[in-house]
């Protein structure tokens, strides 16, 4: 259970790291690629948290 929440936190941390790195990039293509990676990490965090919520719902039944 804690591993699930930890993985969500790690994905969000990585997304923020990508945003910070992207902000320092002069090349627009590189910056956009890093921002896309950040979006993907956020998406993975959302998916993981939804799976966690579903697991908790089924355990409660």
Region roles according to the model:
Residues 1-61:
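Long, non-catalytic architectural segments outside compact domain cores
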């Amino acid at each position: 259970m804690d591993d699930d929440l930890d993985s969500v936190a790690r994905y969000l941390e990585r997304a923020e790291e990508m945003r910070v790195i992207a902000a320092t990039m002069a090349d627009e293509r590189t910056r956009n690629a890093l921002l896309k990676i950040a979006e993907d990490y956020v998406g993975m965090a959302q998916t993981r948290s939804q799976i966690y919520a579903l697991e908790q719902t089924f355990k409660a039944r």
